[in-house]
Amino acid sequence: MMILCRLQGVSFVVAVVNYCWPSLPDSLTKDDFRKGLVKFGLWLLKHVPGLLYWWMTQKLFSSANAMEKNPVFFNDRDMEVLKRTPGFELLSENKLEQKSVFDNLRQDFMVGLGKWEFDPLTLKDPLPEDEGSVHLWAGFEDRVVPVELQRFVMEKLPWIKYHEIPHGGHLIVYDSEVCECILRALLLNEEPEAYIRATTELIVS
């Protein structure tokens, strides 16, 4: 409670949705190829992390890193970000050669996408009575975290202020205009009308 009293609010940007959450219906994820990738990745990280580390850093085969600059995961705007942002090193081969970086990412992945002991989709508003606000920002064309999952989270947790970037991908935080809107919404309580999705279509029958 002491920490909550000090918070102005919270902003989640392209937040990862865990396929293991009990409230997430199979009808929403059964055809999502990412679900299988996550399951396989968790198995590798748990049982043979050394093999995965070798594969991600080896030089024998090209494109060892499946995510780096891959249009399967990044839309056109994301690809432009990757081209013009020299410091962007998301899962890059050179960065992963540092074993400590790989180990930290491994722990993050296993905790974030492994089995949790609670269901976040049943949480109550931690900042009631206008004490603060919680925001969720999503890219309509996000190919890492599908927008349908973000919309479902919004439906289950209506106290979250949901913002959807029409042509945004997974790297919307690198868009200076969007980044400014995120900060203004959080710190000044300014609502960017262009990025507010007031209602959603029925996602799960």
Language model features: what each stretch is:
Residues 11, 135-137, 163:
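Hydrophobic/aromatic beta-strand patches that form the interior of the parallel beta-sheet core
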Residues 128-131, 135-138, 142:
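Short beta-strand/loop motif that positions the catalytic acidic residue
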Residues 21, 26-123:
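Alpha/beta-hydrolase
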Residues 1-26:
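Conserved hydrolase catalytic core segment
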Residues 143-149:
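Conserved alpha/beta-hydrolase "acid-adjacent" motif
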Residues 4-5, 125-131, 156-157:
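Short, conserved loop/helix-junction motifs that constitute active-site signature segments
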Residues 117-131, 147:
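The feature captures the conserved acid-bearing segment of alpha/beta-hydrolase catalytic domains
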Residues 151-205:
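Catalytic active-site module of serine/aspartate enzymes centered on a nucleophile-bearing elbow/loop
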